[in-house]
């Protein structure tokens, strides 16, 4: 059975998460109880809650524990609850809601026009395509059927001396 986020931004402030830490806990619990699928950049409710909360709080993901006590503005709480409600009730993947996704350690703009980048090819790129390719650094690379272009752009980033073409229909 799914779980619906019933708290709205206009309800009593006593009931709403007021700090980053409270928001992380709340979002994680809601996501755990819902029937959403993880696998679009995260594989569990806590990590997805962190991405969502840090996004609305405008904090870097690599923030330390000191941010847990940081208060959230009413606007941030309203945005958080809206995103969480869409995530749970419409089952929209978080990268589509936030318009950002990570691939091969790089951040990309993301929306429903292309598949969310989550290919195992990221690990191949980061590992210089070892053990399947052991020659000199490639001079030309083609990303065919590139979609949003994340693979080709990541390859261009990690192989700066290569000429990279991205092609899609």
Regions found by a protein language model. Name each.
Residues 8-104:
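N-terminal auxiliary segments of SAM/dcSAM-dependent transferases
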Residues 68, 78-169:
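SAM-dependent Rossmann-like transferase core, predominantly class I methyltransferases
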């Amino acid at each position: 059975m799914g779980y619906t986020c019933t708290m709205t931004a206009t309800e009593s402030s006593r009931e709403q998460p007021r700090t980053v830490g409270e928001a992380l806990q709340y979002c994680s619990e809601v996501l755990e109880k819902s029937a959403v699928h993880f696998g679009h950049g995260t594989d569990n409710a806590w990590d997805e809650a962190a991405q969502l909360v840090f996004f609305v709080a405008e904090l870097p993901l690599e923030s330390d524990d000191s941010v847990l006590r940081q208060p959230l503005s009413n606007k941030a709480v309203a945005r958080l609850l809206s995103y969480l409600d869409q995530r749970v009730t419409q089952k929209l993947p978080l990268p589509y809601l936030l318009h950002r996704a990570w691939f091969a350690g790089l951040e990309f703009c993301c929306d429903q026009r292309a598949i969310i980048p989550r290919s195992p090819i990221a690990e191949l790129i980061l590992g210089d395509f070892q053990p399947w390719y052991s020659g000199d650094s490639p001079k030309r690379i083609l990303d065919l059927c590139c979609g949003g272009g994340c693979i080709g752009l990541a390859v261009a980033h990690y192989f700066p001396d290569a000429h990279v073409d991205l092609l899609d229909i």
